[in-house]
Curated annotation (Swiss-Prot):
Species of the source: Buchnera aphidicola subsp. Acyrthosiphon pisum (strain APS)
Protein encoded by which gene: rplT
Record-level Gene Ontology MF annotations: rRNA binding; structural constituent of ribosome
Protein name as catalogued: Large ribosomal subunit protein bL20
Protein family (similarity comment): Belongs to the bacterial ribosomal protein bL20 family.
Alphabetical list of InterPro entries matching this protein: Ribosomal_bL20, RIBOSOMAL_L20_CS, Ribosomal_protein_bL20_C
Gene Ontology CC: ribonucleoprotein complex; ribosome
Any GO BP: translation
Length: 118
């Protein structure tokens, strides 16, 4: 029976994990067993946060729109409802960009939303 030698494969696998753990603090970047756990945990955090990023950006856009709309003495919910009634379909990302970079256009949208509510 032939002897199976797999030291090369194990070494390559360890090197791969330690390369992924580069920049981690202390033993997490030097010791394979700890580094392996850290890399797995980092992957879990990355997976979770890729989903949370979408929620967080939507929250940011909504708070920016809300702040801009309140300068015109209107609430965010009424503004969105007014836009829907006026059949203006602009998503929140674009609305927040307009609110930041083009206040005149945003005020025109607020005016249209107010007219649609009356």
């Amino acid at each position: 029976m032939a002897r199976i030698k797999r030291g090369v494969i194990a070494h390559a696998r360890h090197k791969k994990i330690l390369k992924q753990a580069k920049g981690y603090y202390g033993a997490r970047s030097r010791i394979y067993r700890v580094a392996h756990q850290a890399v797995i945990k980092a992957g879990q955090y990355a997976y979770r946060d890729r989903r949370q990023r979408k929620r967080q950006f939507r929250q940011l856009w909504i708070s920016r729109i809300n702040a801009a709309v309140r300068q015109s003495k209107m609430s965010y919910s009424n503004f969105i409802f007014g836009l829907k009634k006026a059949s203006i379909n602009i998503d929140r990302k674009i609305l927040s960009d307009i609110a930041i970079f083009d206040l005149l256009s945003f005020n025109a949208l607020v005016k249209k939303a107010k007219e649609a509510l009356l």
